Design a protein with these regions (language model features):
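Beta1/beta-strand and adjacent pyrophosphate-binding region of the FAD-binding site
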Residues: 3-17
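Core beta-strand elements of the Rossmann-like FAD/NAD(P) dinucleotide-binding domain
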Residues: 5-7, 186-195
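C-terminal catalytic lobe of FAD-dependent flavoproteins
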Residues: 294-383
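Flavin (FAD/FMN) cofactor-binding and adjacent substrate-gating region
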Residues: 94-162, 167-168, 174-179
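Conserved beta-strand-loop-beta-strand element in the redox core of flavoprotein oxidoreductases
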Residues: 173-191
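Dinucleotide-binding Rossmann-like beta1-alpha1 core, especially the glycine-rich loop
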Residues: 51-125, 248-249
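Active-site substrate-recognition segment that forms the wall
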Residues: 23-27, 84-86, 202-325
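Glycine-rich FAD pyrophosphate-binding loop
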Residues: 27-46
């Protein structure tokens, strides 16, 4: 018979959100046990890989404020763990007026400095970029790259330093909700806790459903490509919103690896819970090379590496964060949560503690999109 242990809070899933949450809760004096089926950096997980983009250019002030909090959180983590986590190159957003106007309005309202550029201005400042007469650009300095592998190591150390017990790999097999506590059954033991945070990425929907909580989540398979393009390694990150309203493209430099580019949507290929790796989609890779030829025609598109990993979409692309006592949901990261890691950890910890936050309306489990919408793996990310 497996052992039974008692703790204040169990965190299921130790990706960027789970680790950040475990650290935040432990710092507040809670006893915390975190478990993860795979372990940090495993290719089956959403938080794997060398890098993620970081930016404050969002079309909602709440996201901008959360991104600014995250920047400060990453800097504190760099100092406490004595490791470089951010490469701040700035970011340029390209696209039509309606989208860029919304980004500018949200940044202006939160006192973020940025430069607005017409097509000629983009060409002068960023000569590697080809832009059309109907396009504009926004540049802000608070953009660049999170060194994701290093960040996961730093977050693991931070949570452990705060007193959290982290167990990887340890698979959760059941969540059993009782009137005054929750039992989390793993392949090794039974954990009894007052609260449980479910931050299990694409496995979250199935876990929550089995515990009686329904959230519209769609696991998806995402793909990223790294280009061997040394001339871009000191250039800013880019988000291309595209004039035709199609799926956008983002890119950013990754020291020692290459220039990372990806479409901002998941694949239609089904995600399966026991698959550990996916072969590259060469058609998608060719599409990125074609985009590069249009946007950066002087850059020779030499592909260094293509990787795939899962993520989890909501119907509207906003996160699913909230409480269904005694469960705390931290899911539906929709392909753009990593940058917010430390800030999301504090936010989810506030949810667990019953603290009100403005951002919670945006991520509410009761918002119409989650109650009546249908999440799709290939939903383009509009954020």
């Amino acid at each position: 018979m497996s052992a039974t242990e008692h703790t204040d809070i169990v965190v299921i899933g130790l990706g960027v959100v789970g680790l950040s949450t475990a650290a935040a809760l432990a710092r507040r004096g809670n006893s915390v046990v975190g478990v993860d089926r795979w372990g940090s950096g495993h290719p089956a997980t959403s938080s794997t890989g060398a890098s993620r983009s970081i930016r404050v250019a969002y079309d909602d002030e709440r996201y901008v404020r959360l991104a600014l909090d995250a920047f400060a959180g990453w800097r504190r983590l760099e100092a406490s763990q004595d490791v470089e986590l951010l490469v701040q190159t700035g970011q340029v957003d390209l696209g039509p007026e309606p989208k860029l106007g919304a980004l500018a309005a949200a940044m202006r309202a939160t006192d973020v400095r940025f430069d607005e550029l017409d097509a000629a201005g983009v060409g002068r400042r960023f000569p590697e970029l080809a832009v059309g007469p109907g396009e504009r650009g926004l540049f802000h300095a608070e953009g660049g790259t999170v060194l994701a592998d290093a960040a996961m190591g730093a977050l693991t150390a931070d949570a452990t330093d705060a007193g959290a017990e982290l167990s990887m790999p340890e698979r959760c097999t059941a969540i059993e909700v009782a009137p005054d506590e929750v039992e989390v059954v793993t392949e090794r033991r039974t954990l009894r806790a007052a609260r449980v945070v479910v931050a299990a990425g694409p496995w979250s929907g199935e876990m929550l459903r089995a515990a009686g909580v329904e959230v519209s989540l769609a696991p998806a398979v995402a793909q990223v490509t790294f280009l061997d393009a040394p001339q871009l390694l000191d250039r800013p990150g880019i988000v291309d919103w595209l004039l035709d309203g199609g799926v956008g493209v983002y890119g950013h430099p990754v020291p020692g690896v290459g220039y990372k580019v990806a479409f901002d949507a998941g694949s239609t290929e089904p995600w399966l819970p026991d698959v550990e790796a996916w072969p590259p989609d060469l058609g998608e890779q060719d599409g990125l090379v074609a985009w590069l030829g249009r946007r950066m025609p002087a850059v020779e598109p030499r592909v260094a590496l293509t990787q795939r990993h899962p993520w989890t979409m909501t119907p509207d692309g906003d996160f699913a964060i909230g409480r269904r006592d005694p469960l705390v949901v931290a899911a539906g990261c929709s392909g753009h949560a990593f940058k917010f890691g430390p800030a999301l950890g504090e936010l989810v910890a506030d949810v667990a503690d019953g603290v009100a936050r403005d951002e919670l309306d945006l991520f509410s489990l009761d918002r119409p999109a989650l109650r009546t919408g249908h999440a799709s793996p290939s939903t383009p990310i509009s954020r």
